């Protein structure tokens, strides 16, 4: 999967660990995962286990 920046990772991608996984399904994150970015990326969701 493609990594994405969770809100808990910090304000920007520079120098921060990207702990989320970009999820492209319109229904949201898979079972047992949660959306870790409040406003969401441009496409899909940023999900974390």
From Swiss-Prot:
Disulfide bonds join 4-46, 6-36, 29-47. It holds the Pfam family Toxin_4. Keywords: Cardiotoxin, Disulfide bond, Ion channel impairing toxin, Nematocyst, Neurotoxin, Secreted, Toxin, Voltage-gated sodium channel impairing toxin. It is found in: Secreted; Nematocyst. It comes from the Eukaryota. Its main location: secreted. One of its GO terms (molecular function) is sodium channel regulator activity. One of its GO terms (cellular component) is extracellular region. GO terms for biological process: regulation of signal transduction. InterPro entries: Anenome_toxin (IPR000693), Myo_ane_neurotoxin_sf (IPR023355). The record marks 12, 49 as: Key residue for high affinity and preferential inhibition of sodium cardiac channels versus neuronal channels. Binds specifically to voltage-gated sodium channels (Nav) (site 3), thereby delaying their inactivation. This toxin retains the greatest capacity to discriminate between the cardiac (Nav1.5/SCN5A) and neuronal sodium channels (2.5 nM versus 120 nM, when electrophysiologically tested and 14 nM versus 400 nM, when tested by ion flux), whereas its paralog Anthopleurin-B has the highest affinity of all anemone toxins for the mammalian sodium channel. Its ability to differentiate between cardiac and skeletal channels appears to be associated with domain 4 of the channel. Belongs to the sea anemone sodium channel inhibitory toxin family. Type I subfamily. This is Delta-actitoxin-Axm1a.
């Amino acid at each position: 999967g493609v990594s994405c920046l969770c809100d808990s990772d910090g304000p920007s991608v520079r120098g921060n660990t990207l702990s989320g996984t970009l999820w492209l399904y319109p229904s949201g994150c898979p079972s047992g995962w949660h959306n870790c970015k409040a406003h969401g990326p441009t496409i899909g969701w940023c999900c974390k286990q």
